[in-house]
Amino acid sequence: MKLRKISAVLLSMAMAVSMAGCSSGGGGNAADTGAAAESTEGAESTDGAEEEGASAASKDTYRVCFVARASADTFAAWLTSEMKAAAAGYDNIELTCVSGEADDNTENGLLEDCITKEYDLVIVQSNNNAAQAPYVQQLTDAGIPVITTNPTTHQDDLDGSGDNSVLTGTGTVDADPIAQAQVGAERAVEEVPENANVVVLRGPSGNFHAEKRREAWDTYFFSQREDVNILYEDYANWNSDEALTLMEAWIQSGTHVDAIISMNDNMAAGAIEAIRQNPDYVNADGTTNFLAYGVDGTAQGCLLIKEGMLTCTALQSASDLAKKNMEYASKVLNGEMAITDVNDYVDAPEINAENVDEYIQIYVDNGEISANQLGE
């Protein structure tokens, strides 16, 4: 089936295509993926204070750095691609993209580098909220405006105070991880068979979205379905390869897995790949003997739904996140608003077999899926 081939191709390609370093807008040069690109000289932007905002507004080009968490994370790769596209719409913004490669030390080093290179504004996608929070604070202390995105960095991440407000001095553009996971969890209450055995794939420990999505499954599914048995649960860190390895080991027990509960589409895809050729899970006619739930609504996830392998996902639109990030970055840099006034969230609509064609068409239109690959 062509869709199976497409899913496999996306699984391997998504990690490489979007995370190449970028410099968009203002005619900038390409940046190195693993470290911040060399910066041009320029005055630091401010936190939106009136007199400093007026000074910032006089610059011809603003240098913005997006620090993504990992190139192997298909959503982070998608978000990077969309950041480049959104930045291209602003003539006075030069965007540099770098990746922390799912390593806290690497990402923290990149955040320190943003201070050294005096970026005018930094957009941070943390790998581990608590690990990155002190370095986000260093950026704000240096007078560099910071927007945290996917996930938000909270005050509690810095000081353990239990204060879940946005980290002091920063702004955020995000999605609600509880609402995202609630989409699949509520469906699963009705769909998962009685006394089912399920496996749970978790994102990185300490990551706000990973933890809150898992909490949502407790609230909206496991508390309602006490008959369900969690056969295995482990951290696959948003990574499809790690999920594939875990699933290959789990099915060796011989106990049938009735449902895959994954905190993102990428891990779900890896687990599905592990059982794709197993007749206990996929029949000769392509129908399945398992359910699978994801989050993110990636092109890969949509194709798996179309194929009948993924039951549903919740869209976390990287396009919307990127557009909002760049819109607010522009307003802050041009002195139109304070960084602390940036507080916006995107919706999480459900994608399932009934409406997946609508979302696949979006990916065809933006080039992430080709019409030829779909056989159209």
Model-derived regions, located:
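Short, solvent-exposed amphipathic alpha-helices that sit
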Residues: 75-89, 180-184, 208-228, 242, ...
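Periplasmic-binding protein-like
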Residues: 65-67, 118-126, 145-150, 199-200, ...
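Extracytoplasmic "Venus flytrap"
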Residues: 57-90, 96-114, 119, 125-130, ...
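Short, low-complexity disordered leader/linker segments with a strong preference
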Residues: 1-63, 88-89, 137-144, 368-376
